[in-house]
Amino acid sequence: EKRLVLHQMCRGQLGEAVVADGVDKRAFYTGEQAKITEFANKVHNGEIVNENGEKFTTVCQIGIGGSDLGPRAMYLALENWAKANNTFKMEAKFISNVDPDDAAGVISTIDIAHTIFILVSKSGTTLETLTNESFVKDFIKKAGLNPAKHMIAVTSETSPLAHNPDYLAAFYMEDYIGGRD
């Protein structure tokens, strides 16, 4: 791909500025982290709620490959610690397989009305992720709910998912995430 590898810019300790294409990537990611933190706090304290005015209790991430493995590993590594330290906020589920039985199995374990879904696709065109999004949206609609009130996107600013009214919010990553030198 002949791009910088800057996935480390998503971490909490960003260090020095990294300038690429004339843009301070550290400033970009610091801003995105602040937006994500603000959104998460609003979900946890009940400022962002479902269409019935009720808090979300579960988060379900839809992604594949790198859009699934890191967040899943982090959740599994920290879940018991968070529970032991009384900082556990929400149960997390993950949909990353295009087998409809797998997605249906995950969906069957959640209370759809109290679940917020995170769709993760850098390009916004990943077929497997979009297939699972369609499956989940159908399930939300069958429950008499509005998918736009239950979904957020994590994508690049140039993706079809960006600035899209079908999502409560969108958070951005750069093309340098997953880049190869």
For every predicted segment, state its role.
Residues 38-45, 53-181:
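Glycine-rich phosphate-binding loops that contact phosphosugars or nucleotide phosphates
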Residues 1-51:
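Extended, charge-enriched "interface" segments that sit outside catalytic cores
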